[in-house]
Structures are given as C-alpha cells and as structure tokens.
Amino acid sequence: MENDRADKEVAEMSKIKVNEQRAVDEFQELTAIDAPSFGERQMADRLIVKLKELGFEVEEDNAGKHFGGNAGNLYAYLPGDLPGDPVLLSGHMDTVEPSKGKKGIIGENGVIRSAGKAVLGADDVAGLV
C-alpha cells in the first residue's frame, strides 16, 4: 500500500516542468554573491527575500554572533496540507575560497563554469537554487 502511494507521488512529481532559464538565472545571481565563512549576511538577506516571495515563513537565529559571523542560520517553513511526512532540505550559505569576483559563463553545451579562478557553485550554493 505504501509503495502504491509512493508511485502515485512520483507520477505526480514527474508532471512538474522545470523552468531551466529561471534556474540558470537564479544560479548566476546567487553564485555572484560573495559569502565567505562568517560573512554570509548578503546571501542571507537575499535568501530571506526569495523565500518569503515563495510563501515561506522565515526565521533567523543568532548563531553568527556566537561564532564571529554576521548572519545566523535560516529556518524556512512552508505550511502544507499534503499527505505524507514533512520534507527537510539543508544547505549552507558560505562559499569556499577563492570566492571573490565569481562570475559564471555558459558554454555551448549549456554547462556553467567559472569565468576565472574563483570557485563557482562547487559547494552548497548550487543547492540553494
């Protein structure tokens, strides 16, 4: 019985269309934000705006103050009424070094890569999109 429900949920999810251009634009926007460890404020502020636009309730703790950072952890909740267990997604906002001046370029094959020597989304920033 549980497998039948899971099969139906997967079938419904397969109907969802991904807006590839929106995903690329979001990726480019977020990876352009400099967010080194302990300096994630700009990333946190941008994510708070985006999450609220999507209907999430957003909270921020004060963990940054305890560890010398300028942003806390973000918790975003999206109330729902679908059957099944809640889903938890987790990521981090800081980027690996070198991260200053990141810029992505899109190759002919559609692969986004760094335009220079800075790391581009090779950490959880790619997962924030």
Can you say where each PLM-predicted feature lies in the sequence?
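Predominant activation on well-ordered alpha-helical scaffold segments within soluble catalytic domains
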Residues: 24, 28, 45-48, 128-129
